[in-house]
Amino acid sequence: EQQELIDATKDKFTQETYKDEENGVSLDYNLFIPADYDASFSYPLIMFIPDSSAAGKSSEEVLSQYYGADIWASDGEQAKHASFVFCPVFSETVVDDDFNTSNQIDTAVKVLNQLMKDYNIDTSRVYTTGQSMGCMTSLYLNSLYPDLFAASLFVSGQWDINILKPLENKKL
């Protein structure tokens, strides 16, 4: 069933590259645009961040190995609520168990901001999720940008509780 989902959705994503002129980092990413995208209507966006085993893999491999992005682009989910799906493809581990981070995370946020400018994305309905490294990255992003995401789904991750202090009274 998982492989069927991947096979049915992976080709619905486009593979893009963003060049961060500020820090020189290039970031590949997968982007799903709702099938009947209408620029006069605003859409939610879900950012899915895979675990560290995806680091260094191609955009296509990330979609073929993991279904965290694919599930949101499935016909069933899109029928319920058409949405954009953004899946950054990191060339390295972007956060580790000692809470060290990569500047690729900053570039992913720049891509997200650019997508919100390029498309009619409802900035009050931007979500993040991911497992393991993806969860940790989502936690980190919530600590840096506590008002960026409407909600987050954290799966199998951890983060330094002191860094998360700004989120203490926020409903995630």
Put a short name on every predicted segment.
Residues 22-24, 38-42, 77-81, 121, ...:
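Extracellular/periplasmic catalytic domains that process cell-envelope and extracellular macromolecules
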Residues 36-37, 41, 94-132:
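Gly/Ser-rich "nucleophile elbow"/oxyanion-hole loop immediately N-terminal to the catalytic nucleophile
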Residues 1-44, 129-133, 141, 153, ...:
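A domain-start/cap signature at the N-terminus of enzymes
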Residues 45, 49-107:
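Active-site machinery of serine-nucleophile hydrolases
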Residues 150-172:
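The feature captures the conserved acid-bearing segment of alpha/beta-hydrolase catalytic domains
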Residues 44, 83, 125, 150, ...:
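Alpha/beta-hydrolase fold active-site loops
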Residues 140-150:
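Conserved hydrolase catalytic core segment
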Residues 55-57, 94-98, 135-139, 159-164:
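Extracytoplasmic/secreted cell-surface and envelope-processing proteins
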